[in-house]
Regions:
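Conserved catalytic region of serine esterases and O-acyltransferases that act on ester linkages
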Residues: 3-195
């Protein structure tokens, strides 16, 4: 691991030596590193800006353009991926304001979200536990994909693009527990949307 890290740092220094921002003429023009960075950030995005203003939708941070029917997703998952945040040494659980289907209300194993937006991400919990099942994601009654929490078989947060459109429109998103997994758990950690 240390050899790889050293090689990466050596490569970084080589690239810095040959890049435009570190050349002598930049310093002769009186540009500081901050000025060069500001100039670079003012340009057009290299890949695009479709998801530049993604906002979180969860139990706590609602959205006036969204109507939610929880169905059987009325529990809150407390076993979450945790990370160090804001220079704190103790870990903080990610997405604590979630919707969990606990496998007990098999007659209402559907979560429905009506939302007006351009793009929508589903953020769901990945897990290696055997009591966790998959869910089908439908948009306006059309199947989009199956959200399978066993993709990585570890405690992670998965983000999946549900739809991305040019103009905002009203959509009905249903997250339905797979028929064979009705007695298993599934956690919607939240949604990312672009108005």
């Amino acid at each position: 691991g240390h050899t790889i890290m050293a090689d990466c740092l050596e490569y970084l220094l080589e690239v810095c030596d040959t890049s435009d921002h570190a050349r002598v003429d930049s310093f002769q023009m009186g540009m500081t590193e901050e000025g060069i960075l500001e100039q670079c950030l003012c340009g057009e995005p290299v890949i695009g800006s479709s998801f530049e203003k993604v906002k979180l939708l969860d139990r706590r941070d609602g959205f006036y353009g969204a109507d939610i029917v929880e169905g059987g997703f009325d529990a809150t998952d407390r076993e979450l991926q945790s990370v160090e945040m804001d220079q704190e040494l103790c870990v903080t659980p990610e997405f604590p304001y979630n919707w969990m289907y606990d496998g007990k209300k098999t007659d209402c194993a559907v979560f429905e979200l009506k939302i007006t937006c351009r793009s929508l991400f589903l953020i769901y919990k990945d897990s290696g536990e055997v009591d966790v099942g998959a869910a089908d994601v439908l948009v306006d009654g059309v199947f989009r994909f199956r959200a399978d929490p066993h993709v990585n078989n570890g405690l992670h947060c998965n983000a999946a693009l549900v739809f991305a459109e040019e103009e905002a429109a009203r959509h009905t998103v249903c997250i339905r527990i797979a028929e064979e997994d009705l007695d298993k758990k599934f956690t919607i950690l939240g949604f990312g949307y672009v108005e």
